[in-house]
Amino acid sequence: MSGSYDEASEEITDSFWEVGNYKRTVKRIDDGHRLCNDLMSCVQERAKIEKAYAQQLTDWAKRWRQLIEKGPQYGSLERAWGAMMTEADKVSELHQEVKNSLLNEDLEKVKNWQKDAYHKQIMGGFKETKEAEDGFRKAQKPWAKKMKELEAAKKAYHLACKEERLAMTREMNSKTEQSVTPEQQKKLVDKVDKCRQDVQKTQEKYEKVLEDVGKTTPQYMEGMEQVFEQCQQFEEKRLVFLKEVLLDIKRHLNLAENSSYMHVYRELEQAIRGADAQEDLRWFRSTSGPGMPMNWPQFEEWNPDLPHTTAKKEKQPKKAEGATLSNATGAVESTSQAGDRGSVSSYDRGQTYATEWSDDESGNPFGGNEANGGANPFEDDAKGVRVRALYDYDGQEQDELSFKAGDELTKLGEEDEQGWCRGRLDSGQLGLYPANYVEAI
């Protein structure tokens, strides 16, 4: 027997050189266009994150700057603390710049390169993809035709081998069977001879076609290599370009290498190191401690021309440097805060008590009883006047009430010189509110 045929012996490889396996290289061109879109989406999402973070920093700085300015901290440490808010504002601006660079530079750069590198066709797809497809198909067409002939020749040869083996088996078995006549035996022998001739013919043809394929293979490889290198050059441009873009993105994101960013933290450190505890203590001693001036009691001659009163006189609001006295609670509010509200917040850094000394508890604003007609401003009055809100009001301080137009509340005192009244909500909350925001019911 000249050979054997076994269909299971056929191997299907995944090599680039197999017919049609160039399609992965062609698909890479389409993938490159999609990857440009993916990178632009990636940059857009990061830009949104930068924008949101910048806004959060701004909101945080605004809120805490107000709290610090209205809080009890004072002096150089207050300035150091406030420097953190300045840092947040500046870093917010830098992250806004990052967002702008990502969108206006990096994303636009990718978009423009993609537009120049890929050209859409009217019928769909890209010109570059079609050119690669046509190039590979043209280079592979002659070799693919030879491979088709080779497969047919191989199949014919293997089939002839199979028939030869079957004929030989029948001829050998007939020798042991008594029922087979000499004439039948001769036919079986002739069949074996004919199959051997077929095997010889198909083998010669198979070998000839295989030789022809071998001759055309170098030209086939050269043509395929040429088209593949063109695709490689196109892909190389994409890879190099996207690497440059990623480096640009890194440069924009890496604020650690930004001179402005480093300057922000140098300034912050200087502001913090500028805080001086001893200076702050001296300031507090001179403005709120034993270092304050005092009109000590002195003997005063009776003057008949002056009105004589036996009741305790109220001390008129005394103008202090950078502060005004509020008659609502007897506290001094810094002029920097006077623009926010013309009364006293739950805590004002310049708070002083301007009451003259008396052994009568009526002069104590924190006393629990009344004397000489003086009421405790912090006591929950049992009586009051019901009023209705004309407008919405959101309290700006902890000691202010918040209400909506139409809400009813209880007015507990008369309007002070700066237009504020004390009142109580139905929930029991006590606080101040603008007098002209309500009307009597």
UniProtKB/Swiss-Prot annotation:
Result, substituting residue 130 to E: Abolishes membrane tubulation
Membrane topology: Peripheral membrane protein
Residue numbers of Phosphotyrosine PTMs: 391
UniProt domain SH3: residue ranges: 382-441
Principal location: cytoplasm
Tissue: Highly expressed in brain. Detected in hippocampus and dorsal root ganglion neurons. Detected in rod photoreceptor terminals in the outer plexiform layer of the retina (at protein level). In CNS neurons, high levels in the pyramidal cells of the hippocampus, Purkinje cells of the cerebellum and large neurons of the cortex and brain stem.
Biased composition, class Basic and acidic residues, residue ranges: 311-321
Segments forming domain F-BAR: 10-280
Coiled coil: 23-272
Keyword Phosphoprotein: yes
Keywords: Cell membrane, Cell projection, Coiled coil, Cytoplasm, Cytoplasmic vesicle, Endocytosis, Lipid-binding, Membrane, Phosphoprotein, SH3 domain, Synapse, Synaptosome
Quaternary context: Homodimer. May form heterooligomers with other PACSINs. Interacts with both COBL and DBNL. Identified in a complex composed of COBL, PACSIN1 and WASL. Interacts with EHD3. Interacts (via SH3 domain) with SYNJ1 and WASL. Interacts (via SH3 domain) with DNM1; the interaction is reduced by DNM1 phosphorylation. Interacts with DNM2 and DNM3. Interacts with MAPT. Interacts with EHD1. Interacts with TRPV4.
Protein name: Protein kinase C and casein kinase substrate in neurons protein 1
Lineage, uppermost ranks: Eukaryota, Metazoa, Chordata, Craniata, Vertebrata
